[in-house]
Structure formats: structure tokens, C-alpha cells
Swiss-Prot record:
Keywords: Coiled coil, Periplasm, Signal. Residues 1-16 form the signal peptide. Its main location: periplasm. HAMAP family: UPF0194. This is UPF0194 membrane protein YbhG. The lineage of its organism: Bacteria, Pseudomonadati, Pseudomonadota, Gammaproteobacteria, Enterobacterales. It is found in: Periplasm. Gene3D superfamilies: 2.40.30.170, 2.40.50.100, Helix hairpin bin (1.10.287.470).
Length: 332
């Protein structure tokens, strides 16, 4: 008669254990089983020449894989090569002028300037003496007023020539003014800047891939005359691979930077990729229409960027991805 209560008691204990275990499993799934839905981020870049010109050649076509540093296309280099030659010549001229300013005047030039002063002084002395004689003759009415005026003009001209020669000799002996040297230096620096710009323009007439990727579109063909900045290629960036997902505020504490997650695609549901949350948006936004969970579409959510650590070529941009949080994914 005592066995029946014992059996009932054991049944109650077992039932309580089952309920407790189920509750624990449910809670663990709630805490560690967060599932989000996102897409592989679409990352493209438009490539263009920084300078304008005629397209000489294009080395790749749509669908080609490209590598960072690879030559993708070239403009006609000739105009930029000519501009570079002109810039080099400009630097040579400016450098020579600056060197002359620094060196000052040679002894031979100073001697020539001194001789010119002596010659101008002699001419002035003669003109002054002649003018003095003409004044005496004018007083005795031997010459006309016109003759006296001509003598005065000759004297004044000789005086101006003498002053110019004296100023030139003074400049030669004292060297070039600091302002003239500074101006020559500025002209040299300007010519050097023009040379650097010409070198850069020639370099930029070759289009180099900035990173690895896949060529999506080829917008022009050889022979096209482009303005600077005109799009030549559109490239899909393949590395790193990012997944964009959204989490609501209730689960935001689980989606912290550094948290590791598993990423599932329809093509390989049993073999997940591994990812790590790299960025959580600091501001909330309304859920984009691309999110596949209807319950979230009217909520305010936070955007996540998840870096795929073992990405391969099977992950295509725009592909839907299921993001699974849990102990098996691990924590940073």
C-alpha cells in the first residue's frame, strides 16, 4: 500500500526535473541562440584617371579578377611627356638665374662697370664745359638761344648717363639685393612645383588597381577622350568580406564588437563561415526593407558590420546570410 505514494513522488520529481531542464534549455537558447539575418555587403568603387586625355589601351574586361598594383589602362602619354620636358627646362632656367643671384657679379663685370663710369664722367665733364662756354657766348650774343638750349640738353643727358653708370657700379660692388635673391628663389620653387605636377600627371595617365577585386563594368573603350575623373571601370572589392546585419535594442547587448558568430548561407547550410563583429552603429535606424524578418521591419535597429574571417569565393556580394550567436561561436 505504501508503494503507490512512492511512485507518485518519484513521478513528481522526474516531472519537475524535466520542466527545470526544459526551462534551462529555453533560457540558454534565448541567451545564446540569437539569430539575425543579413547580406554580404556590396562594396564597389569607380576607377578613373585623375587627368584627362585619349584612352590609349585597356588591359582588362568585365568579369576579370584584378590585383592591387595591376595596370588596368593607359592614356596617350605624349602630351604629358612634352609637358614634363617643358617643366624640366623651366627648372633649369630658374636654377641658373638663382645661382647667378647668389654668386653676385664677377670681377670682370665690376671692372667693366667702373670703366663705364669713367667714360660717362669724361663725357659729362666735356658736356658741362661746353655748356659753360656756350653760356658766355650767349651773354655776348654770339650764339642763338637754340644753341644754348642744345648745349644744356647735352649736358643733362650726359649727367643722367653718368648717374646710371654710377648706380650700376654701386650695385655690382654691393651684390644683388636680398629681395632680388628671394624673388629668384621663389621662381625656382615655382618651377620645381610645376615639374612635380608634370611628373604626377604623367604617372596618373596610367590607371593602377588600388586593391584586389572583380571588374563589374567597363565604361569606355580605347580611343575615347575622357575628362579628368570620368569613370573607366567599376570594381567590386572582394577583400575583406563584410556582412551587414541589424539587431534590435533588446538583443543589442549580445552584439558587441569582438563577438564571434557563425554565418550560414543557403549553399552550405551545414558548413558555416566564421565571423567577428567589427562595428556596431551608435545610432538607431528603421529596419531596411532588405531584412528578411517581418517582425523587425517596423522596429528601430542598430546596424552591424561583421568581418568574415574565413571567406572564400563562394561568398558573393549581396548574398543573404544567417548570423547565429551562441556558445559554439565563441567570444573574443
Amino acid at each position: 500500500m505504501m508503494k503507490k505514494p512512492v511512485v507518485i513522488g518519484l513521478a513528481v520529481v522526474v516531472l519537475a526535473a524535466v520542466v527545470a531542464g526544459g526551462y534551462w534549455w529555453y533560457q540558454s537558447r534565448q541567451d545564446n541562440g540569437l539569430t539575425l539575418y543579413g547580406n554580404v555587403d556590396i562594396r564597389t568603387v569607380n576607377l578613373s584617371f585623375r587627368v584627362g586625355g585619349r584612352v590609349e589601351s585597356l588591359a582588362v574586361d568585365e568579369g576579370d579578377a584584378i590585383k592591387a598594383g595591376q595596370v588596368l589602362g593607359e592614356l596617350d602619354h605624349k602630351p604629358y611627356e612634352i609637358a614634363l620636358m617643358q617643366a624640366k627646362a623651366g627648372v633649369s632656367v630658374a636654377q641658373a638665374q638663382y645661382d647667378l643671384m647668389l654668386a653676385g657679379y664677377r670681377d670682370e663685370e665690376i671692372a667693366q662697370a667702373a670703366a663705364a663710369v669713367k667714360q660717362a664722367q669724361a663725357a659729362y665733364d666735356y658736356a658741362q664745359n661746353f655748356y659753360n662756354r656756350q653760356q658766355g657766348l650767349w651773354k655776348s650774343r654770339t650764339i642763338s638761344a637754340n644753341d644754348l638750349e642744345n648745349a644744356r640738353s647735352s649736358r643733362d643727358q650726359a649727367q643722367a648717363t653718368l648717374k646710371s653708370a654710377q648706380d650700376k657700379l654701386r650695385q655690382y660692388r654691393s651684390g644683388n639685393r636680398e629681395q632680388d635673391i628671394a624673388q629668384a628663389k621663389a621662381s625656382l620653387e615655382q618651377a620645381q612645383a610645376q615639374l612635380a605636377q608634370a611628373e604626377l600627371n604623367l604617372q596618373d595617365s596610367t590607371l593602377i588597381a588600388p586593391s584586389d577585386g572583380t571588374l563589374l563594368t567597363r565604361a569606355v573603350e580605347p580611343g575615347t577622350v575622357l575628362n579628368e575623373g570620368g569613370t573607366v571601370f567599376t570594381v567590386s572589392l572582394t577583400r575583406p568580406v563584410w556582412v551587414r546585419a541589424y539587431v534590435d535594442e533588446r538583443n543589442l547587448d549580445q552584439a558587441q564588437p569582438g563577438r564571434k558568430v557563425l554565418l550560414y548561407t543557403d549553399g552550405r547550410p551545414d558548413k558555416p563561415y566564421h565571423g567577428q563583429i567589427g562595428f556596431v552603429s551608435p545610432t538607431a535606424e528603421f529596419t531596411p526593407k532588405t531584412v528578411e524578418t517581418p517582425d523587425l521591419r517596423t522596429d528601430l535597429v542598430y546596424r552591424l558590420r561583421i568581418v568574415v574571417t574565413d571567406a572564400d569565393d563562394a561568398l558573393r556580394q549581396g548574398m543573404p546570410v544567417t548570423v547565429q550567436f551562441g556558445d559554439e561561436a565563441g567570444h573574443e
